[in-house]
Amino acid sequence: MESSTAFYDYHDKLSLLCENNVIFFSTISTIVLYSLVFLLSLVGNSLVLWVLVKYENLESLTNIFILNLCLSDLMFSCLLPVLISAQWSWFLGDFFCKFFNMIFGISLYSSIFFLTIMTIHRYLSVVSPISTLGIHTLRCRVLVTSCVWAASILFSIPDAVFHKVISLNCKYSEHHGFLASVYQHNIFFLLSMGIILFCYVQILRTLFRTRSRQRHRTVRLIFTVVVAYFLSWAPYNLTLFLKTGIIQQSCESLQQLDIAMIICRHLAFSHCCFNPVLYVFVGIKFRRHLKHLFQQVWLCRKTSSTVPCSPGTFTYEGPSFY
């Protein structure tokens, strides 16, 4: 049987009979990996937020999306310590069981929402720049972000409704609730990826006819972030679908699926620390801002405490920190 903290596992009668030897692997790997991911995500995403607020133009819609994507990753990473502490049993009661899974759903849906909207925005900016002239107002920024978070809360309600504490485990109380949640996640994931794929096909067709290096840089980073998200979450969504029991499985195949589920879940849940790394390696402006920030901090440490020292602001250079 898998760890009690697997969010979307439903142990039917067959899987209950098929006891396996992956509990030790699951527990140890979860504790070690999630502790590391939590620290990396906390540091990395906090640095991204600092760079955005300190050095960048928050009137840019793209930067607002990046900021909210950071908040979503931080929200997810804050769930990991609870996940670690609840490896053997759920100790926080029904309310926090529901709340915990709802926050998980909100961070999951908000991430894919913001990635999809970022791609659509970049598609419009490249393919039809005139159509984006009126969407950079404060009212538009507030409206878009509010709608995304509201929709994320709405989509995550089933995760809260169908979860409860059963035998000291926080899990789905009804099999149909598990099925509905998995189908919703997978359909939403596939639709979003379909929209993103369409947008990038059109973007690439347009960019082949233009030589704007700024546009190429921006598209390249957003594309890298989207690909990283897809590669992280697609295997997890696939194993979730297989766990629904749609495909008839033997005891041996269930054991193999349990191991695959652990590995895919670890990969998916580690995604919250990936984006800051991608920004460093792909985002030229972000890398320059980060270097400037570290130089300022280093100079402040070397300066006498009697001399006031505060990091300055970077000169605004463009619509986003790519």
UniProtKB/Swiss-Prot annotation:
Residue intervals on the Extracellular side: 1-27, 86-98, 163-185, 244-259
Transmembrane segments: 28-55, 66-85, 99-120, 138-162, 186-204, 221-243, 260-283
GO-annotated cellular components: plasma membrane
Pfam families with a match to the protein in the record: 7tm_1 (PF00001)
Disulfide bonds: C97-C170
Entry keyword annotation includes Translocase: no
Gene Ontology terms describing biological process: chemotaxis; release of sequestered calcium ion into cytosol; response to cytokine
Membrane topology: Multi-pass membrane protein
Gene Ontology terms, MF aspect: chemokine receptor activity
Gene3D superfamilies per the UniProt record, alphabetical: Rhodopsin 7-helix transmembrane proteins
Tissues expressing the protein: Expressed by dendritic cells from the thymus, slpeen, subcutaneous lymph nodes and mesenteric lymph nodes.
Family: Belongs to the G-protein coupled receptor 1 family.
Role of this protein: Receptor for chemokines SCYC1 and SCYC2. Subsequently transduces a signal by increasing the intracellular calcium ions level. Receptor for XCL1/Lymphotactin.
Protein name as annotated: Chemokine XC receptor 1
Species in which this protein is naturally found: Mus musculus
Name of the gene encoding the protein in the UniProt record: Xcr1
